[in-house]
């Protein structure tokens, strides 16, 4: 009789441990997936194509077009990802979506300056220097949005970045009270870059 009781207790203990492990696994996987789904669903309605952003110029008067940094090459030129962001921002500027472009990127080291590369590229593509503003402390998406609101006093903007990044950028912008629209800059296949 005692052996059966010990086996029953051991079985219940094993079932409890397995149940707990499954619960923890569900929480560890489910909570981040749920949060990600919520961020995507809450920001997606404010995404626009380049054509929509240009057509909505009068309805949405943006203070600025914001380009988020994405790395530079060893020679100081924009990476392929950053180049696409800059090209889309240039097109939006030329469509008069906003009167200025804010380049926000990493310049935390004297030998690495995303923002200078971004501004140089935009100027070479015909954007007037007086309409380019540089945020040299955009070390993260959060930092960029914080500085847009608190340093550059942006109330409304069009954020340009790749779609995968746009959700987070839009979420952070809204968290700081910025009325933002997002335009994805997925012009290339980046799988080999």
Residue ranges and their predicted role:
Residues 35-193:
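A structural signal for short, hydrophobic/glycine-enriched beta-strand patches
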Residues 2-52:
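N-terminal type II signal-anchor transmembrane helix
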